[in-house]
Curated annotation (Swiss-Prot):
Organism: Methanocaldococcus jannaschii (strain ATCC 43067 / DSM 2661 / JAL-1 / JCM 10045 / NBRC 100440)
InterPro entries: DUF5400
Membrane topology term: Multi-pass membrane protein
Cysteine disulfide links: none
Transmembrane segments: 12-32, 39-59, 63-83, 98-118
Record's subcellular location: Cell membrane
One Pfam family from the record: DUF5400
Keywords associated with the record: Cell membrane, Membrane, Transmembrane, Transmembrane helix
Protein name: Uncharacterized protein MJ0759
Amino acid sequence: MVIKKGEIMNEIISLVSLSVIFGAMLSGFATFRLTGMRLMPHFASLMIAFILTLASLFISNNIIGYLAIAFQVITPLTVCPTICNILKTQFQNTGIYSAHLALMGMMFILALGNVILF
């Protein structure tokens, strides 16, 4: 079995993506508790992205890999409509959301890296 350089890099970036998604789940839980059910589609998408990314590390299947990347791209986009409305009306609470939004930005960039390397 020969391991190519691109395969190792793909696994590394997937592992980093997984850690960012896990951190986003933790910071997102606090955000989710504050905003209620308005962020449910985003939180569900985040959990699906976590499960698919974890599965793509253990199962060598292109469909699972591409689904993981797709959800890594979709998840940051699902937070935009809800969080923009919240930040307009509750700007004093922006510190609470900043960690989660930063992780969503990192996740989007890592997903683009996954697209290039996959």
